[in-house]
A protein has these predicted regions:
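Terminal substrate-recognition subdomain of acyl/acetyltransferases
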Residues: 2, 8, 138, 152-168
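Conserved SAM-binding loop
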Residues: 5, 125
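Residue-level detector of beta-propeller blades
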Residues: 7, 66, 143-145
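Acetyl-CoA-dependent GNAT
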Residues: 10, 18, 23-94, 105-107, ...
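Conserved active-site alpha-helix within GNAT-family acetyltransferase domains
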Residues: 98, 102, 127-145
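Conserved catalytic-core motifs of GNAT/GCN5-like acyltransferases
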Residues: 122-124, 142-159
């Protein structure tokens, strides 16, 4: 097993779409989006999601085989552009519980630290997602709040929010 992570580019749109859709199908409760919506995306939309300086999508590989995906972006809701948010993490089930999420967290946190102006990172998950809770806390994220949310699968459940301050 040779594990590597790399940032995707527009040229990677096809593998991005395949792994993202696979993730949405296999673990729909883990995401703020859904397969029905994203399966209708055009090539142009997949490419757009991989373009730009204010976001990054990373794929984790076992040798040359993609086994997971994750993303980070500057938060559009922060007019000062000082906040990044983590989104869309997923690993193939047989690669879970091997510490690989540590590599995904480190990659995204490093991206945010190296992105000019970012002072904090936010992340959230469903209250029932114990694995995300553990991973967020393990990487220094501090609980900030919960609020009720209706998720894209129609379920209503609390969203648990955290932040990691990068600069004081």
């Amino acid at each position: 097993m040779r594990i590597s992570v790399r940032q995707l580019t527009e040229a990677d749109w096809r593998i991005f779409s395949e792994i993202r859709l696979k993730a949405l199908l296999s673990d729909p409760a883990a995401f703020g989006s859904n397969y029905a919506l994203e399966s209708k995306f055009s090539e142009a939309e997949w490419r757009r999601r991989l373009r730009g300086d204010d976001s990054a999508v990373f794929m984790i590989f076992d040798d040359e085989t993609p086994i997971g995906i994750t993303g980070v972006a500057v938060d559009r809701d922060d007019p000062a552009k000082k906040t990044a948010f983590l989104w869309g993490s997923w690993l193939e089930p047989e690669f879970r519980r091997r510490g690989l999420s540590n590599l995904l967290y480190k990659t995204r946190i490093d991206w945010a630290k190296n992105h000019p102006g970012i002072e904090r990172i936010v992340v959230s998950h469903r209250a029932s997602n114990a694995a995300s809770k553990h991973a967020n806390q393990k990487h220094g994220f501090v609980f900030t709040r919960t609020h009720e949310k209706t998720w894209t699968d129609g379920a209503t459940e609390d969203e648990v929010c955290y932040e990691l301050k990068l600069k004081s």
